[in-house]
């Protein structure tokens, strides 16, 4: 096989609740790509200021002063209804969209969680493109194993909006297993992947042998993750403060954001320390003056606060083992820990206890292993990784509502995918000429208790007594775990098909519009970036010219000196005026550059006379401005013409 060009490469993306990561296969090895800040993971945080949109570390840094417009953990909201948001606590506003889905409001604008995910993916895409020096179009994106069909489609939509062709959706524990087991030889092994991340918990049982990775069973909880551990500490902090001062901080977004950051920091510290001090000065005030939050949190107290959360991970483990037909935990060869929360000693110990004292594997980086697995899957699809077969499963049963509101599964959970299955149904009433097919996903006996994925109608059925018409319903699940459902009347041949849409509240037209908006804004974003680079170069020119003026000003004529000082003043005033266009800044920049050549000549003469060398001259600032500045990662929200700035 020939060399894969950058545009043909398939990157692997772990779109996480707390952090995201991107990797790629190079020379048969998966490599994690660092972002522009030099980090191997990027915070899944998006912030909206008055003039710009920030993503990643820049967004996270300003959260304390912009809490209501800083969006984090949006992955926990994807595919969820507004009335199902009781467990999600955040300082930003969540509101019901027209269709009842949970959306997010920032700076007065409504955003689907799908859009927020797309903004994070854009940043990840830029990280990969900076590394390759070429456009990147294709990606494998991971999702929690227990994500339902609509959430998977929503994730794929986010990739589309970000300008990516999502060639495969892969379950996070399965990706981790790929990363763990790729170089483990041909020996048959049964492994468990215990994945406790920022927003979700998954557990998968896999058999690995001779390059075949077969998922035997999966289970989980999409409402359990590190965010819940943070919330437990936050509640403890706020309750302690209330008891001490009588002040309730729950309705103070800025205080809540500060407490959240402190809680997360304390949680991380307690993985390696027995106690930590939490101090937040000036957290609030009353008639007596400023109030400070200060308390000591021990590891034992923290473990007590979250013991119920840790215990909630055990029941899914039991169900996964039962579904896989494993009655004895000694049959498990390896337990692989994934997700940042698995660094917590109490979590490690509870997993060890449940699996019969088996020490969990610590040979993988829990923050990077999922992205590495996604990159390996990308390598499989390109042919860069050979002799590997991945067999995943449907995490939840899929079926339709039948007479009496009963849920009738067509595809049972843990069925290997891709798969296709048909079943014949009939009418419930005499003379019925149309049927409504309601598609559900879940494990409850009554349809209403499961997740409604979508519905469609099949009309034009020939009138006949009830039970006579034969309507064939077919479920087709592709390798991404995304469902297509069709219904066909065998007598008339009439057929209706539905592809389950995401629960992100976005129609295909809206998604297309967002994609177009992103493309249209690319030129504007580039202008904004060039403007910032130009301003940075101008500031550097002013600084170096003033230094040279101080060193060599007495060696040029007073007229030249006055001219340079005037040019510096004009450029500085231009930079301080937000309405100055890039063209005007460039003109003032060029004018000062030209005048500063006199200083360069004076410096050269001084060096020649003294026989020494120096590089602190104004002429040192010449050249391409792009080569002297660091890229600033943000996007302009306002769509004003650049010249008006």
From Swiss-Prot:
It comes from the Bacteria. This is Chaperone protein DnaK. Gene3D superfamilies: 1.20.1270.10, 3.30.420.40, Actin, Chain A, domain 4, Substrate Binding Domain Of DNAk, Chain A, domain 1. Residues 609-623 have a biased composition (Low complexity). Acts as a chaperone. The modification Phosphothreonine is found at residue 200. Residues 625-645 have a biased composition (Basic and acidic residues). Residues 603-645 are annotated as: Disordered. Keywords: ATP-binding, Chaperone, Nucleotide-binding, Phosphoprotein, Stress response. The keyword Nucleotide-binding applies. GO terms for molecular function: ATP binding; ATP-dependent protein folding chaperone; unfolded protein binding. Belongs to the heat shock protein 70 family. The keyword Kinase does not apply. Induction: By stress conditions e.g. heat shock.
